[in-house]
């Protein structure tokens, strides 16, 4: 059976529309305001590729009468039925939102379906942003599929004939229940007691891989069932791993990367660039509301149009379709002021569609995520590498090991600290470098014996120093990285590129015991008389026609959390040395993102997008603004 569907309307859709209307408040009528007169005129003006509406949200209440008796307690109308009528009247597609592995009602009725913690206890309920919302994370290996999800999916598809299904909440977990423990044992052959297994040094990495396989099986089962009921119904699950080994079920890639709560604009750009290597259509929902999940004292308010357009530009500049994500009025009616912003966003995208529909990456720099245990978003090292390379205007693609081929077009590959690099990929990397390619690696990537051999590293003592400094060649300001540094011993024609220097008073035990890391007089290098650490901070080796540079610390993971301009300065100097002539160079500030792409007609496009976050009042991390002033976010498009 064919498990994916080619849908031209997905590829040609530049703008989609999500109505975020949880059926979660049991003492308020649900859906009475979503009338033909309120909804259809807006849909006709917006002309979205599809409209996504809820059938079931995380609390488990359905927006239609289900045989499982899960419908909203004050359901005003059958919402999928209403929106099936509305979308047909507006000549657009209907996509159904369905909460996958979070279901409050299922967890209440079937406690044995709930996920377990690593300590062997069922995961408790989460109340989210309301005392009346109860969510439970559900184990994908439980009877939840057979006795719950498959029943509701059949109801949805047979009764409402949707054009697509968008699944949320498959990102929860991992689950450590006996079912999932048994799967881990089957995958690894481990036979020790659970108490011993979870203390193994390789437990976290192996469990991550096993859990990825479990959830991949869940998504495959989900999509196969959808296709068995309606072969042309497209499927996606939001915010899932973009590794190719898990790509098969997806008809399109998608995510709800809402800012400023969990995601920055850089995060949206990163996932669009990763999705862009997957040969499937992709979109991202940008929310018109400051969704204050982490700060219950802050009232959610509508964003300015400038901010919404800025987010939309990040998606569009990287080849994605823009999903406008709106919250309706409490009774389900679309809010006129928000719809005016939606229409303005639609016009903004429509005026530029030829610049990104059918476009592709210029493919000149790529970040390689080779560790199969990495997180959904690339892990700290992958995320930090993108943050740094985007700040240096490298417009990086993100690939996994399957993207390392003889035909890959990249001038430069960056291997951020990766705990695992398989020998076959390492061999392809060596072939790439010998043919003239450039490779920058860092930190734990030296776990690979093949990479050590390529670099000419004879011995390595991992994590030998907890702090270190580099004196730059083009700046009088040193770069300090308070992360573990590896002490490497070189052989052959490998060269030290930068020596490592110690912090002043680095081994004073009383200082280490009493001073917090943020104390201003802590972790300084003596710039006039720096103390050598006796080992390199960075090494290099020419290999065939190409060159490898390795940074002996986990700089990308550290840059992800800190974003130090000194770290970025060192990375800029290293890249300028490694690649003195590059395809594109700009003196734009680091917060101006460059996306270098090819239009469908072959034109080379350089999109410049302002990534300045503005004043994100609901973000747990506050931003420093120049002169304390919020400036309008503008996007500039250049051919």
Each language-model region and where it sits:
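N-terminal structural segment of carbohydrate-active enzymes
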Residues: 2-61, 90-92
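Stable alpha-helical elements in mature extracytoplasmic
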Residues: 35-39, 76-83, 145, 149-152, ...
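Active-site-adjacent "subsite" loops/lids of carbohydrate-active enzymes
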Residues: 96-160, 169, 192-208, 217-221
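Proline-aspartate-enriched helix->loop->beta-strand connector
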Residues: 48, 161-165, 170, 231
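Short acidic, glycine/proline-enriched helix-loop-strand junctions
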Residues: 6, 62-85, 90-92, 173-193, ...
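Aromatic-lined carbohydrate-binding/catalytic grooves of carbohydrate-active enzymes
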Residues: 39-40, 44-81, 102-127, 131, ...
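Active-site mouth loops of central-metabolism enzymes
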Residues: 21-35, 134-148, 295-305
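Carbohydrate-binding surfaces of carbohydrate-active enzymes
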Residues: 2-6, 11-13, 42, 83-86, ...
């Amino acid at each position: 059976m064919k498990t994916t569907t080619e849908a031209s309307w997905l590829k040609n859709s530049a703008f989609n529309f999500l109505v975020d209307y949880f059926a979660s408040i049991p003492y308020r009528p649900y859906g009475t305001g979503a009338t033909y007169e309120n909804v259809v005129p807006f849909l006709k003006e917006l002309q979205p590729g599809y409209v996504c509406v809820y059938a079931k949200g995380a609390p488990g209440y359905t927006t239609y009468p289900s045989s499982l008796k899960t419908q909203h307690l004050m359901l005003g109308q059958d919402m999928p039925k209403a929106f099936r009528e509305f979308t047909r009247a507006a000549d657009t597609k209907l996509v159904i939102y369905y909460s996958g592995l979070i279901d409050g009602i299922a967890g209440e009725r079937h406690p044995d379906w709930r996920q377990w913690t690593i300590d062997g206890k069922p995961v408790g309920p989460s109340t989210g942003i309301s005392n009346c919302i109860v969510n439970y994370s559900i184990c994908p290996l439980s009877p939840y599929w057979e006795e719950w999800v498959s029943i509701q999916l059949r109801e949805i598809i047979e009764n409402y004939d949707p054009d697509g299904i968008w699944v949320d909440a498959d990102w929860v977990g991992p689950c450590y229940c006996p079912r999932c423990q048994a799967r881990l044992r089957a995958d690894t052959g481990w036979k020790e007691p659970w108490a011993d297994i979870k203390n193994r040094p390789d437990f976290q990495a192996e469990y991550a891989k096993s859990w990825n396989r479990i959830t991949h099986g869940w998504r495959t089962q989900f999509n196969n069932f959808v296709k068995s009921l309606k072969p042309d119904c497209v499927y996606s699950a939001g915010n899932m791993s973009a590794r190719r080994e898990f790509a098969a079920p997806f008809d399109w890639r998608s995510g709800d990367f809402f800012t400023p709560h969990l995601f920055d604009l850089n995060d949206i750009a990163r996932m669009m660039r990763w999705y862009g290597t997957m040969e499937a259509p992709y979109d991202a929902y940008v929310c018109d509301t400051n969704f204050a999940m982490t700060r219950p004292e802050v009232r959610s308010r509508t964003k300015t149009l400038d901010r919404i357009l800025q987010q939309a530009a990040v998606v569009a500049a990287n080849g994605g379709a823009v999903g406008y994500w709106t919250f309706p009025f409490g009774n389900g009616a679309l809010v006129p002021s928000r719809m005016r912003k939606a229409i303005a966003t639609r016009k903004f995208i429509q005026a530029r569609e030829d610049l990104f529909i059918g476009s592709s990456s210029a493919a000149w720099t790529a970040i390689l995520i080779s560790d199969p245990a990495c997180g959904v978003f690339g892990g700290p090292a992958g995320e930090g590498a993108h943050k740094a390379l985007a700040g240096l205007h490298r417009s990086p693609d993100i690939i996994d090991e399957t993207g390392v081929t003889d035909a890959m077009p990249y001038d430069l590959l960056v291997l951020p600290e990766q705990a695992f690099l398989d020998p076959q990929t390492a061999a392809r990397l060596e072939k790439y470098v010998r043919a003239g390619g450039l490779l920058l690696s860092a930190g734990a990537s030296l776990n690979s014996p093949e990479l050590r051999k390529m670099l000419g590293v004879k011995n390595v003592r991992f994590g030998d120093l907890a702090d270190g400094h580099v004196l730059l060649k083009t700046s009088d300001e040193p770069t300090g990285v308070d992360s573990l540094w590896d002490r490497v011993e070189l052989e052959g024609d490998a060269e030290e590129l930068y020596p490592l220097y110690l912090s002043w008073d680095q081994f004073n035990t009383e200082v280490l015991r009493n001073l917090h890391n943020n104390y201003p007089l802590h972790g300084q290098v003596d710039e006039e008389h720096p103390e050598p650490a006796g080992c390199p901070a960075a090494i290099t080796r020419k290999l065939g026609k190409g060159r490898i540079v390795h940074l002996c610390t986990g700089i990308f993971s550290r840059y992800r959390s800190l974003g130090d301009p000194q770290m970025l300065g060192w990375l800029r100097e290293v890249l300028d040395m490694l690649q003195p002539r590059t395809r594109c160079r700009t003196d734009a500030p680091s917060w101006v993102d460059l996306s270098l792409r090819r239009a469908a007609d072959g034109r080379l496009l350089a999109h410049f997008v302002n990534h300045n976050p503005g004043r994100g009042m609901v973000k747990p991390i506050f931003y420093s603004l120049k002169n304390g002033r919020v400036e309008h976010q503008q996007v500039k498009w250049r051919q």
